């Protein structure tokens, strides 16, 4: 049973699908359980647990009655996907090769915790991702 998993609402579904379909198996051992780049929905699991779902933002906006509102506004990030990985540098390069955009390069952060290393990037739709190891 999935107690809680992330569902990203994306405007650039096909690009995001290709990005996550390329990086989630290597970063998290996730397997795609449904969906195609045609959308409007796709999901990846590790074992029986949901890891990530993508849903077309416009399709959900039509369901919940917000289609007339702007999809994007200039604000600071409100959420971040975080993935613990064995090698932050390799994970960062993997994500960049598949369409991720750098936000902050791999950096050791001892002030955050012993052995902590992080990198920050954005998926093709602009969602913030942190890769971390410790």
Segments predicted by a language model, with ranges:
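Short beta->alpha transition motifs characteristic of CBS
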Residues: 57, 113-114, 120, 131-134
């Amino acid at each position: 049973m999935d107690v809680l998993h992330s569902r990203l609402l994306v405007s650039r579904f096909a690009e995001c699908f290709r990005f996550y379909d390329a990086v989630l198996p290597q970063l998290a051992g996730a397997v795609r359980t449904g969906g195609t780049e045609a959308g409007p929905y796709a999901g990846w699991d590790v074992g029986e647990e949901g890891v990530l779902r993508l849903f077309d933002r416009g399709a959900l906006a039509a369901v919940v009655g917000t289609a007339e509102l702007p999809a994007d506004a200039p604000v600071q990030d409100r959420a971040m996907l975080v993935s613990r990985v064995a090698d932050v540098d390799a994970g960062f390069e993997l994500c960049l090769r598949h369409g991720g955009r750098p936000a902050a390069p791999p950096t050791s952060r001892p002030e955050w915790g012993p052995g902590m290393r992080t990198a920050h990037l954005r998926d093709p739709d602009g969602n913030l991702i942190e890769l971390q190891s410790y």
